[in-house]
Amino acid sequence: MSRPRKRWRDVDGVFLLDKPQGMSSNDIMQKVKRLFQANKAGHTGALDPLATGMLPICLGEATKFSQFLLDADKRYLVTAKLGERTDTSDAEGQVVETREVHVETPQILTALEQFRGDILQVPTMFSALKHNGKPLYEYARQGITVEREARPITIFELNFIEYHAPFLTLEVHCSKGTYIRTLVDDLGEVLGCGAHVTMLRRTAVADYPVAEMMPINELQLLAESFPLSELDRLLLPTDTAVSKLPALHLDVEQSKAIGFGQRVKFANEQQLSGQVRLFSAENLFLGVALIDGNIIRPQRLITQSA
């Protein structure tokens, strides 16, 4: 007798996954999607298979706002091994160079200074960035090196945690587009000994609370033991993906017009500009709009349930 087919459903919100080591971000996202039986899912910035930690999974209408989390600041805890460079700049790659380590803590503290603030970083060849429509890692696996332009990034904080040679642990608060593997590789070159990542854990995305993260095995157990309604209680509201934007509450007529995708005039007593979160008179999240003087221009709107 065949198993009953799983019924997929519309479910909206953000699930804070504590990603396990050894799985790709896409594979683990698909598993979360299946457990919630969600029609639609998307993650908010890939973590390497080696990495663990916070991976917000957007379900349903929340996928419309995943770009805001892709663009958000991130925090990481990283351990590097000095004295070895690998082709991927992490422990999953092949060692391509070995050097002796004659590095003391004061040298590390001095070297860290040049990586703080606004810097330029050349992305690793083992990345999903595309060249002529093809991911760089595909070229790298064929032994081909493609010239990459340095990209501007910001390292807001780069904190020394501990050093027990040859292992160095750092805490990083960085902008979007930062490759921690490249940061470690570049630091190793400044120190003159080379380095690669042996442990990487993302500890924060935007302002999401670490305490709300859940490992996939716990979610699996809940899915096997409780109805979907209990799983839905784990989801954070869709508007948390855009929580850094100022909020604008509309009246009934304004909400109706916005719902039809129309531009709306308003008094703009708060002197708002740029992007805002829109809420109805009943405090329902409507989506994101752009404020242009006293005009509200809808950009991404929630499809309201009938």
Swiss-Prot record:
Reaction(s) the record says it catalyses: uridine(55) in tRNA = pseudouridine(55) in tRNA
Annotated active site: 48
Record InterPro entries: PsdUridine_synth_cat_dom_sf (IPR020103), PsdUridine_synth_N (IPR002501), PUA-like_sf (IPR015947), PUA_sf (IPR036974), tRNA_psdUridine_synth_TruB (IPR014780), tRNA_sdUridine_synth_fam1_C (IPR015240), TruB_C (IPR032819)
GO MF annotation list: RNA binding; tRNA pseudouridine(55) synthase activity
Family matches, as Pfam families: TruB-C_2, TruB_C_2, TruB_N
Top-level taxon in the UniProt lineage: Bacteria
Single biological process term from Gene Ontology: mRNA pseudouridine synthesis
Keywords per UniProt: Isomerase, tRNA processing
Uppermost EC category: isomerase
EC number: 5.4.99.25
Functional summary from the UniProt entry: Responsible for synthesis of pseudouridine from uracil-55 in the psi GC loop of transfer RNAs.
Family: Belongs to the pseudouridine synthase TruB family. Type 1 subfamily.
Protein name: tRNA pseudouridine synthase B
The species this protein was found in: Haemophilus influenzae (strain PittEE)
Organismal lineage: Bacteria, Pseudomonadati, Pseudomonadota, Gammaproteobacteria, Pasteurellales
